């Protein structure tokens, strides 16, 4: 994904896409609506998803081509990823790859990717079985506290955590590629 653009660590981004129910979007929108003093949240989701008019939420309902989406991901510095469940964690890894300060759910596999050195973990308050896995529902109060924690950080603190995430992402990607090549050579 890369992180060549200048990051704005005062802007929040949430990529709900077509599965906003699983991405914690309703909780995010509810909190943003309660806090008009918070910076603008850029929220990409389908038009039919959860929607509340708030002066500090900018909705993007239109289809975004890859180049435009990458521009948002690479320039907006704080990514909200309070997923109820993740398969592999592509959503979170994309945020890490762009050197974003990432907030996600403190449950597996999300907390296997984001650690306190690489982002902020939001506690969950409820779980529910889903097929062979578990959905973890973030605690709205804890998410609010974590957002306030980010807002209280200096630009440098935000950037350092995001750089740690990017560094881990690059190391992990290199490790994966090496292991894959070794595995394929051994076949």
Question: Whereabouts are the PLM-identified features?
Answer:
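Short alpha-helical segment that forms part of, or immediately flanks, the ligand-binding pocket
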Residues: 70, 93-97, 108-112
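A charged, aromatic-enriched C-terminal amphipathic alpha-helix characteristic of glycosyltransferases
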Residues: 138, 152-185
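Short alpha-helical donor nucleotide-sugar binding micro-motif in glycosyltransferases
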Residues: 70-76
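Aromatic "clamp/platform" in nucleotide-sugar-dependent glycosyltransferases that forms part
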Residues: 84
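C-terminal "capping" alpha-helix adjacent to the active site of nucleotide-linked donor transferases
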Residues: 126-159
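Short hydrophobic beta-strand element within catalytic cores of glycosyltransferases
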Residues: 101-104, 111-114, 120-121
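Conserved catalytic-core segment of nucleotide-activated headgroup transferases in glycan assembly
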Residues: 1-66
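A short hydrophobic beta-strand element within the catalytic core of glycosyltransferases
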Residues: 79-80, 103
């Amino acid at each position: 994904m890369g992180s060549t653009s200048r990051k704005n660590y005062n802007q929040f981004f949430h990529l709900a896409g077509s599965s906003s129910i699983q991405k914690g979007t309703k909780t995010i929108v509810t909190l943003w609506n309660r806090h008009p003093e918070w910076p603008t949240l850029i929220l990409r989701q389908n038009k039919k998803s959860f929607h509340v008019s708030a002066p500090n939420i900018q909705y993007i309902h239109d289809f975004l081509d890859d180049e435009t989406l990458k521009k948002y991901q690479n320039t907006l510095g704080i990514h909200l990823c309070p997923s109820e469940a993740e398969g592999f964690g592509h959503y979170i890894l994309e945020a890490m790859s762009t050197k974003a300060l990432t907030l996600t759910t403190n449950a597996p596999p999300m907390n296997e990717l984001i650690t306190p050195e690489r982002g902020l973990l939001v506690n969950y308050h409820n779980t529910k079985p889903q097929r062979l896995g578990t959905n973890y529902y973030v605690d709205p109060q804890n998410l609010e506290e974590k957002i306030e924690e980010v807002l209280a950080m200096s630009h440098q603190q935000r950037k350092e955590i995001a750089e740690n995430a990017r560094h881990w992402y690059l190391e992990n990607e290199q490790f994966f590629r090496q292991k894959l090549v070794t595995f394929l050579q051994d076949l």
